[in-house]
Swiss-Prot record:
Membrane topology: Single-pass membrane protein
Subcellular locations according to the entry: Cell inner membrane
TM ranges: 19-39
Descriptive protein name: Heme exporter protein D
UniProt organism field: Pseudomonas aeruginosa (strain ATCC 15692 / DSM 22644 / CIP 104116 / JCM 14847 / LMG 12228 / 1C / PRS 101 / PAO1)
Family under the similarity heading: Belongs to the CcmD/CycX/HelD family.
General function of this protein: Required for the export of heme to the periplasm for the biogenesis of c-type cytochromes.
Entry keywords, A to Z: Cell inner membrane, Cell membrane, Cytochrome c-type biogenesis, Membrane, Transmembrane, Transmembrane helix, Transport
CC annotations in GO: plasma membrane
Keyword Phosphoprotein: no
UniProt GO BP: cytochrome c biosynthetic process; cytochrome complex assembly; heme transport
Main location: membrane
One Pfam family here: CcmD
Length: 58
């Protein structure tokens, strides 16, 4: 499938809003799937460090 111009490419034969929003939502979900475990690990390590400091003080 070839397009006459970049504008035609973005419009995708009048399906552009659906196509680009689907790509955007997919990328958002992928980013969340990558970021969430990293953030959860960071929170877990911070909580464990806090717990170990409390136990060391007792």
């Amino acid at each position: 499938m070839s397009f006459e111009s970049f504008g035609d490419f973005l419009a995708m034969g009048h399906h552009g809003p659906y196509v680009w929003s689907a790509y955007g939502i997919s990328l958002l979900v992928l980013a969340i799937n990558v970021a969430e475990p990293l953030l959860a690990r960071r929170r877990y390590l911070q909580e464990e460090a806090r717990r170990l400091r409390r136990e060391a003080q007792q």
